[in-house]
């Protein structure tokens, strides 16, 4: 059982010093080098920054070994890190920087030319490399390291106001998650883990820390590979994965290739899914193609440290239910289904809100006490969280029944529809709008924008759509931009004068 994340990772530098903790495209980082360089960086931070450890450190980059070094070095200096991926639009990065109020902004890659960081020190990639060289062989005092209920990382998720919220995950939260994953999923030493998700997305925690804690190798498929289907299909068998961690949507993409099977990936014997609904069709096809593999379906919000339920998906399970269960709760957590209005705990078989209680639950949102109090609460001495997810328990399994609000999962990203709508309303060509998720195979397939446009000079609707998307990409991530656009002169309204979203939903999901 792990009690200190850093101690256990550093121990591999003694046990298997030359074994790669990271390997991709000719770049290889050993456990010995990971310890040595993260020690150097932790020493640099302790020598450079003041003693106030409440402020986190932003680490900007994309799935590189330098990010791992920066993460662990930051932890060794006693501070939490905030991962920010290069794919984020400039405006989003500025929002996160403002909300996090960091002690330092670290660049493991060059910043976009139109982004200027003000209000905190910036460490460029060259300065980072100089710091690693200057403090080489220095070892930070272990007493300075993040411990217990100290924040370990802070991941920013979509917020209903259009501003992201920083979810604080402590060392205790991460220890609880990691011990559960390593034990319940039988992850032995030295396995090769797929890293599909950028580090700014909490699904990445499901491969990053189980890999490092078990003496495994993290093997990323970065955006240059995943953006090109031919490259992706060529790269997967070449990387010789043992453990597959991804969203179901990414697996669906890979299943389009007939060569994605056990014969071409003989070591691939574990699939771990999180981030969105796993459709029966996807699970069934994976069982057909990978007869030696075990498939796990998991569930959990960012606010409860990645995942808190799991179930092994078998043929019998697929045949037994209309949709796949999310599984059973991890041992140090409790789960209740409650009536949304009264808060009363509901019996098995009745649908209500999923409430999570226990060791995995975050302390709340960074610098956002009001938003924290809205969804986090104390339950008999334990931290608890209102997920906003609707669920039901049948035969001891949790089943997902959709969102209680306008929050959805698309390709593993958690998105608040209000966030998109608020951003769309900034566009000069839009007077009013509503975002409707288009469903397919029990999950969100794409986002449809229903728009009342402002006056414009475009002759064709596709020209208007192109102009809107061109404005949107300046301040909204690509995964949040709707794929389909429907233009209207007015919206249907409910009795109380609100947009009739049920009517719009019926139109989109006929």
Swiss-Prot record:
Q: Which GO terms describe its biological process?
A: lipoteichoic acid biosynthetic process
What domain of life?
Bacteria
Annotated Gene Ontology cellular component terms: cytoplasm
Q: In which pathway does it act?
A: Cell wall biogenesis; lipoteichoic acid biosynthesis
- What EC number(s) does this enzyme carry? 6.2.1.54
Q: What is a single molecular function from GO for this protein?
A: D-alanine [D-alanyl carrier protein] ligase activity
Coiled coil: which residue ranges? none
Where in or outside the cell is it found?
Cytoplasm
Entry binding sites for ATP:
157-158, 297-302, 389, 498
Check the record and name the Gene3D superfamilies matching this protein: 3.30.300.30, N-terminal domain of ligase-like
Q: Which reaction does it catalyse?
A: holo-[D-alanyl-carrier protein] + D-alanine + ATP = D-alanyl-[D-alanyl-carrier protein] + AMP + diphosphate
Query: Main role?
Result: Catalyzes the first step in the D-alanylation of lipoteichoic acid (LTA), the activation of D-alanine and its transfer onto the D-alanyl carrier protein (Dcp) DltC. In an ATP-dependent two-step reaction, forms a high energy D-alanyl-AMP intermediate, followed by transfer of the D-alanyl residue as a thiol ester to the phosphopantheinyl prosthetic group of the Dcp. D-alanylation of LTA plays an important role in modulating the properties of the cell wall in Gram-positive bacteria, influencing the net charge of the cell wall.
Similarity remark: Belongs to the ATP-dependent AMP-binding enzyme family. DltA subfamily.
Q: What is this protein called?
A: D-alanine--D-alanyl carrier protein ligase
The species this protein belongs to is Listeria innocua serovar 6a (strain ATCC BAA-680 / CLIP 11262)
């Amino acid at each position: 059982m792990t009690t200190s994340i850093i101690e256990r990772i550093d121990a591999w530098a003694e046990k298997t010093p030359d074994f790669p903790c990271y390997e991709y495209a000719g770049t290889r980082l050993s456990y010995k080098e990971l310890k040595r360089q993260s020690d150097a960086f932790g020493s640099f931070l302790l020598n450079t920054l003041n003693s106030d450890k409440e402020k986190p450190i932003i680490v900007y980059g994309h799935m590189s070994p330098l990010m791992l070094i920066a993460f662990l070095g930051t932890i060794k200096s006693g501070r939490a890190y905030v991962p920010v991926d290069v794919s984020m639009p400039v405006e989003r990065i500025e929002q996160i920087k403002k909300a996090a109020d960091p002690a330092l902004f670290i660049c493991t890659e060059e910043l976009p030319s139109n982004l200027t960081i003000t209000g905190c020190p910036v460490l460029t990639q060259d300065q980072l490399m100089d710091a690693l060289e200057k403090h080489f062989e220095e070892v930070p005092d272990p007493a300075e390291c993040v411990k217990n209920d100290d924040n370990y990382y802070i991941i920013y998720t979509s917020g209903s106001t259009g501003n992201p919220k920083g979810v604080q995950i402590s060392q205790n939260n991460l220890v609880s998650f990691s011990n559960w994953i390593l034990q319940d999923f039988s992850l032995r030493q030295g396995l090769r883990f797929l890293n599909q998700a950028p580090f700014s997305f909490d699904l990445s925690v499901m491969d990053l820390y189980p890999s490092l804690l078990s003496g495994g190798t993290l093997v990323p498929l970065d955006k240059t590979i995943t953006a090109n289907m031919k490259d992706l299909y060529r790269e997967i068998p070449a990387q010789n994965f043992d453990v597959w961690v991804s969203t179901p949507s990414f697996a669906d993409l890979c299943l389009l290739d007939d060569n994605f099977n056990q014969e071409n990936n003989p070591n691939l014997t574990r699939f771990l899914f999180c981030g969105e609904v796993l459709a029966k069709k996807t699970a069934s096809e994976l069982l057909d193609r990978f007869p030696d593999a075990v498939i796990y379906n998991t569930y959990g919000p960012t606010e409860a440290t990645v995942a808190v339920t799991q179930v092994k998906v078998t043929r019998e399970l697929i045949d037994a239910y209309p949709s796949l269960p999310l599984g059973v709760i991890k041992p140090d957590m409790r789960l209740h289904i409650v009536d949304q209005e009264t808060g009363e705990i509901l019996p098995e078989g009745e649908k209500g809100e999923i409430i999570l209680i226990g060791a995995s639950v975050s302390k709340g949102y960074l610098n956002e006490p009001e938003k924290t109090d809205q969804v986090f609460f104390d339950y008999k001495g334990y931290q608890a969280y209102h997920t906003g997810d609707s669920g039901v328990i049948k035969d001891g399994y949790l089943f997902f029944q959709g969102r209680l609000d306008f929050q959805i999962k698309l390709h593993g990203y958690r998105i608040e529809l209000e966030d998109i709508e608020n951003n769309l309303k900034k566009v000069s060509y839009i007077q009013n709008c509503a975002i409707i998720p288009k469903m397919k195979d029990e999950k969100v397939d794409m986002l449809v924008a229903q728009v009342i446009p402002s006056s414009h000079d475009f002759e064709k609707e596709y020209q208007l759509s192109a102009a809107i998307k061109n404005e949107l990409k300046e301040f909204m991530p690509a995964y949040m931009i709707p794929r389909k656009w429907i233009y209207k002169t007015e919206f249907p309204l409910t009795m109380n004068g609100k947009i009739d979203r049920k009517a719009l939903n019926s139109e989109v999901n006929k």
